[in-house]
Amino acid sequence: MKEEIQMRNLKRALSLALASVMLLGMMVIGASAVSINDFTDQDEIVNKEAVALLVDLGIVNGKSDTNFGATDTLERTALAKMVYIALTGTDDASMYADMNVFSDVTAANCWAAGYINYCYSVDVLSGVGGDRFSPYSSLTVAQTAKALLVALGYIPDAEISMYEGNDWAINVMRDAQANRLLDGIGQSAHSPITRDNAARMIFNALKAEMVTPEYQYDMGTQYVTKYNGRGVTLGQSTFGLVSTSALVTGIDTNGNAVLD
């Protein structure tokens, strides 16, 4: 059993380090019940490193234990759960389940109620109008990018970041490009984002630096003059992930990667 766990940790570390992306430095995240190798449709997954990491962290699940659904479009419920876990490091959102923010999202009729209510409370996701959230609707590339930018610390208010109004998608895609959230995506702003590309965008967000807005006031109106980097990525803040380009040569008796 110990050898099996060590082998799993080694494969995890190899897939991360050889791709010059992220490494679980302390290996503090427990082994997931499902890995990318359990998906029978893994040949359809283009962003394998991204999916492997996110499944390992518990951020992303398959449509079932054996099907990831790489080419399926991402639903609003799924993004709410992914962003919640990426920000909190846990999948338990029960304390938010009974907030009853939207008429079509309650603990009784929507499995993602807690995730949705939390994301609404921190401005990551908003409703679609008429007191509704439309939990099972698909998301576009720009909508997903906006949620992740807000998760990184960007302010969604129209007066501050122009993430609302007629040009919101242009402004979101500009900032998403600057933060490299769109690396490897290959879809236009208003295209329904696939689950595969959503995993890649969240993977990119984990590597992006979190920011803090710097405010000024003009005639009683508050606005952001700039965003200051916090010196920590989203992945490091939540999961202790660190970037590395080192080669993994083995794994020690404690299950930690040995780097060259």
Residues covered by each model-derived region:
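Feature responds to low-complexity, polar/acidic, surface-exposed segments characteristic
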Residues: 2-48, 61-113, 122-142, 149-192, ...
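Mature N-terminal segment immediately following signal peptide/propeptide cleavage
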Residues: 51-60
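Calponin-homology-like cytoskeleton-binding modules
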Residues: 119
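Alpha-helical segment that forms one wall of the substrate-binding/catalytic cleft
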Residues: 142, 146, 196-203
